[in-house]
Amino acid sequence: PTSVAVDQGSMVSNSPGEWCWPGMGYPVYPFPRCRALVKSQCAGGQVVESIQKDCCRQIAAIGDEWCICGALGSMRGSMYKELGVALADDKATVAEVFPGCRTEVMDRAVASLPAVCNQYIPNTNGTDGVCYWLSYYQPPRQMSSR
């Protein structure tokens, strides 16, 4: 059988991740348990297995695997906002997010959650399980004291 599509004046798109927006492809406040996991990891704390399992369940619940990294990026941005860290060009403006947690460590912890959870993501940047956007961020420069 042959499929026939009739144009009725509407746009049709099959772009992966097209619906990956807060409230559409993932919750407006994504991954509450992953937030706790990232904060603990970033500060060098011991990973609580139940929190990690809950985080992994929340990631697995995202229906479109193309949305996972976008949702994690959204989570990262809202975590910085909650912690009072300003972003400039989507980069944190401080080197330390909270005592004992450096910006680049937090970014790496968030971007690596798919690998931690053995969750397939199709949009990696050469490293299995690590969100592509990690390579876009550069840690803030330390201001020299003169």
Swiss-Prot record:
Could be involved in insect defense mechanisms. Inhibits insect-type alpha-amylase. Monomer. One of its GO terms (cellular component) is extracellular region. CDD domains: AAI_SS (cd00261). Belongs to the protease inhibitor I6 (cereal trypsin/alpha-amylase inhibitor) family. This is Alpha-amylase inhibitor BMAI-1. GO terms for molecular function: alpha-amylase inhibitor activity; serine-type endopeptidase inhibitor activity. Glycans are attached at residue 125. Five disulfide bonds, which are essential for the inhibitor activity, are probably present.
